[in-house]
Amino acid sequence: SFQGTATSLEVCRIMSRKISEIYPDSEVIAIPAADGGEGSVDVFLKVFGGEKVRIEVKDPYFHDISASYGLVDNGRVAVIEMASCAGIPMAGKTKNPEITTTYGVGQLILSAAQRGAEIIIVGLGDSCTNDGGCGMASALGVQFFDREQQTFIPNGGTLMDIRYIDKSGLAKELSGV
């Protein structure tokens, strides 16, 4: 997208219309592009066809929100953009990566795996997080322990508190991905 102005699909429509106005005999083939950030799922769905799936997940501050991902190739491939649940616009005025989480991204990944996706593409653009993916891993069943052997979900400000990681609870649905 063109951050806060137009999506790549909208830009394609505008450019196609203007080119056709100036060069009426031209054939315009518009191919939207994305960089992995906001709008990437819509571009994949426009180019490859497919289905948009909407679910409830956690936002960067662990509040409930509705976010979506795309399924293409008859559900075999899932396309997820971090921006849909952990994007910069969701940070609001706070914009503090020490307290944000990627937990919602993990929830999207798990949902896609549960629906049978074998390949999961995650676009990392426009993130307001800095938790090293620990929130995402937590949503997928990984446990993080602090020095008191208490489990917690790390964020950018608590990464240094990780003393032990237990992957034994990793979601079984991910085994075929």
In which residue ranges do the predicted regions lie?
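Glycine/threonine-rich beta-strand-loop-alpha-helix active-site module
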Residues: 99-103, 107-123, 128-176
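Glycine-rich nucleotide/cofactor/substrate-binding loop typically near the N-terminus or early
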Residues: 15-92
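Predominant activation on well-ordered alpha-helical scaffold segments within soluble catalytic domains
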Residues: 13-20, 38-45, 106-110, 134-138, ...
